[in-house]
Amino acid sequence: MTVVVGYITGKSGRSSLHLGVEAAQTLKTSMTVVTVVPKPWTTPSPARIDAEYATWADQLGSDSQREAQATLDKIAKGFEVSYHKFASRTAGEGLLDAAEELGAQVLVTGSCPHGALGQVVLGSTTDWLLHSSPIPVAISPRGYRGAKSGKLIRVTCAYSGTPESVQVVERVAALTDQLDVKMRVVTYAIRGRTMFPPRVGVHAEDSLLDAWADQLRETLAKLKADNVVGEDVELQVVTGNGWDAALDDTEWDDGELLALGTTSRRSIKTVFLGSHGAKIIRHSPVPVLVLPS
C-alpha cells in the first residue's frame, strides 16, 4: 500500500507534495509521485511528429520527477519515495489507473493554481476525481506547505445528519482511533439568501436559525448516546450567513484535516459529492479528505 500523489511540473504548485508526505508519514507507508503525460493519438501522423511528441512526453515526465525530488529532498529526507510516469488520455484517468496498479490507500492532489491562497480550489481534474474515485481523495489548499507541527493533530468530520453521514462519522472515528489523533464532528446551519420572504424580517430569520442550530445539537448529541463516537469527541454546530462565513468562523488547529463523505450513486463505491459537500470543500482553509460512499 502507498500514498499516490499526482504531480506535474508547472501545475498546482508543490502543495500536493507537502500533503502527500504528511499523509504517508501519518499512515506509516510509502509515497509514490505519479506524473500523467498525454497518451499519443492512434491516428496516423508523420514519424517526425510522433518522435517529437514522445520526446516531449519523456521530458515532461523527467522534469516533473526532478522538480518533485528536489522539493522532497528538502522536506522528507530519508523518506521512501518512488516516481512513476503514466500515459493516459486524461490526467484523472491516468491517476486512477496509477492508484489501482500501485495499490494506493489514498490519492493526493493539489488545488488549481487560479484561486485564493490558503483555500482548496478545485480544478477540472480534481473535480472529476471527486466524482469517480473508488478510494479516498485528499486535496491540499493552494500554497499549502504542511503543518507547523509536522504531523496530523486532529480530524474534523463534517456531518449532515443523514444515515449515510453517520457511517462516515463511524469511519472517521475508526481512523482517528487507528492514528491516535483527536476527532471533532461539526455540522453547519447556513442562512440561505431566500431563507424567508423579505417581509418576515431579520429577527425571524435569526430565530429560525437558532432553532435549527438547537435541533442540530440534539442530532449531534445522539452520536454519543448511540456510541457512534466516544465521550472525548468534540461536537460543534457552526452557523453562518453563507458557507464562506461558516468555514471562516470554524476554529481550525494547525495540523487539522477536514473529512467528509459523499452521496451514493448507483450503488457504486465512488466519491460523489452532494451540493453541500462541494461548497464545504471550496471554502475549506485546511486539507480535505473526501471518502467514497
Describe each region flagged by the PLM.
Residues A51-R66, H203-Q215:
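A short acidic, glycine-rich active-site loop
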Residues M1-A54, I153-D206, A225-V228, D232-E234, ...:
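Small/aliphatic-rich secondary-structure junction motif
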Residues V106-W128, G150, L257-H283:
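Glycine-rich, Arg-bearing micro-motifs that act as flexible, cationic patches
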Residues V108-S111, P136-G143, V288-P292:
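Short beta-strand elements of ligand-binding domains
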Residues S12, A70-L107, A225-L258, R266:
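Structural beta-alpha unit
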Residues T32-V34, S82-F86, A138, R184-V186, ...:
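General small-molecule cofactor/ligand-binding pocket signal
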Residues R145-I153:
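Intrinsically disordered, low-complexity Ser/Thr-rich linker and spacer segments
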